[in-house]
Amino acid sequence: MRILVSNDDGVHAEGIRALSDALRACGEVTVVAPDRNRSGASHSLTLEVPLRVSRISENGYYAVKGTPTDCVHLAVNELVRPEPDMVVAGINHGANLGDDVIYSGTVAAATEGRHLGFPSLAISLVGRTHFATAAHYAAQLVRGVMVHPLPADQILNVNVPDLPLDQVKGIKVTRLGNRHRAESVICTEDPRGQPIYWIGPPGSQQDAGEGTDFAAIEQGYVSITPLTIDMTAYSSLAGLGAWLDLQG
């Protein structure tokens, strides 16, 4: 098993080291990740400037001056030979719950892997302490995928509570919850008195009831949410056609 590992926190992040170390027991691991933190990059692809790649001497990781999606795309199509059998993104420093997934570079890296034809997982730790716990579950899931492959149009979005391994209650299969709209934008000034803006923290939980990823984490469980690559709203196709007919 050849495993490509990437993330959005950057090639020097603690989470990607913990993940790659744990997955070496499952197969041959190659790390291709952004050269710096690219959290919130979503599925952006660099098209207008060239991508530069360097190799970190002490661990052999590839550092790409680009986005998480760039990293997976470049790795699969150029850097990693033979091609990987699987893509694992993470361990993210913080949650990717609910509508976090539309912004997450970690989820995007896994999505790019699936788009390119490989089974893919996105692993996030809901905190910044117990990376070993998240790495344990990542390795467990990778071994599971080796035996029972995932459906061709899905990735698994995995969130792990920031707890010691023996305090995690188990695993729950969940749906995405939802946050309130984030309205906080912080305005300040640069040293020259010009206005600058910071996008504030994410909104509070809105849909976090039983069955959601939020609820599973709150209860001390690992949350696993299957995400589909095909974003077509099939249930709306007939209704949309009828709506168009009403327009004359």
Curated annotation (Swiss-Prot):
GO terms for cellular component: cytoplasm. Binds 1 divalent metal cation per subunit. It comes from the Bacteria. It is found in: Cytoplasm. Keywords: Cytoplasm, Hydrolase, Metal-binding, Nucleotide-binding. It catalyses: a ribonucleoside 5'-phosphate + H2O = a ribonucleoside + phosphate. Its cofactor is a divalent metal cation. It is an enzyme of class 3 (hydrolase). Its EC number is 3.1.3.5. Gene3D superfamilies: Survival protein SurE-like phosphatase/nucleotidase. One of its GO terms (molecular function) is metal ion binding. Pfam families: SurE (PF01975). A divalent metal cation binds at residues 8-9, 39, 92. Belongs to the SurE nucleotidase family. NCBIfam families: PRK00346.1-3, PRK00346.1-4, surE. Nucleotidase that shows phosphatase activity on nucleoside 5'-monophosphates. This is 5'-nucleotidase SurE. It comes from Aeromonas salmonicida (strain A449).
